[in-house]
Every structure is written in structure tokens, then in C-alpha cells.
Amino acid sequence: MERIDVKDRKILYYLSLNSRQSLQKIGRIVGLTKEVVSYRIKRMQELGIIENFYTDFILTPVGQTIYVRLYFNYQNITPSIKKEIIQYFVDTDEATIVASLEGNYDLMVIVIFPDIYKIHPYLEHMLMNYGDYFKERHAALYFIRNQYNPSFLLDSKTKKLEPHVHRLYQEISYDELDMNILKALDLNARMPITQLADELHSTVTVIHYRIKRLMKLGVILGFGVNINWEKLGYRFYHVEINLKQYHKRLDIVRYLMENPYFRSSHQLLGHASDLEVDFILENVMQLHEMMDNLSTHFPESVKDFKYWSILKTYKEQLFPTRHKN
């Protein structure tokens, strides 16, 4: 576990809110010069705490409209076959996230398709090759993700801001330059506009206008930072909650918003629980304590829950241009 101080935690927090904001602006907020902020960011990158700066955007502008989550549990598996299955998904352009899990599922794959009719052939081809190695498989369609600020990085009293609402299905027109801007920012959300203009053979004025337009249209939802939480002594936990009283769902979300470790909530269709939420926690004991508190606060509402945590991510991207080996 890497040690960081309060200033580093503040820098991470404000990068999570907007990773494209200037170093000077971050410095004013945290009480440091932009040179010191730059040094601290580079240091956290070298330590592996900061993995990369990402751009949140909806999928429709790149011609991909169906966003599907696949869960798998293995059977009759060997390490070599498991590696082969993972590589199979990594090599498919449709897969945007491939990760091995700890908890109720063994493998998660997020895939995107231009229309619903492409889903079955993709799954059919995969099952023809590896279906015998799956004890269970489940699919669900993503619709909305609400992401909240990681207020625990500052202190437990920091209030949650209004969430970034990710509505994954919107009809918005775009052109080749828009798509190339998104591709570049997907690789590095902090890429300077001057560099973007040079690489895309455009001008600073045009690129600046296009980014503002994409944000105004709701294509670009925000700019964040991928943090290796394990380097800081935390882990990511996804919790799937089934309810006895579905009408209490929003009340439960509001209650969870008071928790500084609450990171996001999801709405899905298909094999999905009534409420799916994410936390950044120190350990699984903390997760069980939180769920005990939730059940105590809503004694007639929570039926049961299950969870998973990511063991290793093999691929994470919106555009099929780079893999994690």
C-alpha cells in the first residue's frame, strides 16, 4: 500500500470531478502551486496510483447502441482454458471490459453492439467454442448509471454532489472529427487542445468548439481519473440487492448517498437485481457492516444481496484500439 498525504488525496478528489481542469485551478483549491501539483500527479502516476485519465461519453455517437453485461461462472475449467477464454473476449472488438471477479461470479464481460440483432450471433459463436466450460451465464442490458464523487478521499463530512447521470441511449448526430476527438480523449482526457489539433489536423478554435458542443449535447459526460484503489488500501465492490419492497428503492439510494464510500448506482434490464450499487471500501468486512446497517434501517425492504470485486482487468476501453495484457 502506498502512502499519500491530505494534499494528494485532495488532488485525486478534484481530478475525479474534472480531470481536464487546469493544474493552476487545482492548485488554488488545494493550496499548492501548479508546479507542485504537476509533480505530485506525476509521482502518483509513477507509483501506479493514477492509472490514466478517462473521458465519459455515451456510446451512440460511435455507432454502438446496445450495452450488455455478461456474467459467467466456470465449470470443468483449467488455467490454460480460462486464459484462452479471457483472451477470446479481449480479442473481440465488441468487448469493452473483460475482468475476472471474486465473489458470486467468475468473469464479467461488457459488450456493445450496433443493434439488438447482433447480440445472439456473438453469444452463439462464443458458446459454440466455450459453452461447456460455463456452469452459469447471465446477460443484462445497461440503461443508466449514476456516478457520485468519492467524498471519502477528503473526509466523512464532505457531502455528495449531484451524480453524473449516464443515459446510455440517446440519438445524437456526429461526424468523423467528433469521433476522432472522442477516440483521442478516451486515451487521455488531459490531452492538451493544441496536441489534439495537431494530431487531428485541425485548429485549436475548432477543437475547443467541438468539445464544448459535445459536452452541451450530452455526448461527453465528464472527465475523470482511474485510480488503482488497491494501492491506497481500498477495493471496488459491486453489490446487487434484491428488495421485498421495490417502492423503497429511491429511499435506499438516498440513504446510500450519505455514505462517503458510495460510488455509483445502475439501472439494468434482464438478469439484474432490483438495485445495483458500487462502493470503494477497505475490505469485505466493511461491506457486510454497511449491508447490516442498511438492513437495520430498512428492515422490511431488503430481501438479500450478493457482491463481487474485480480480481484483474484484462481490457477496459470504449474504442477497440488498446488492450491490457
Give the role of each language-model region.
Residues 1-325:
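A compositional/biophysical signature of low hydrophobicity enriched in polar/charged and small residues
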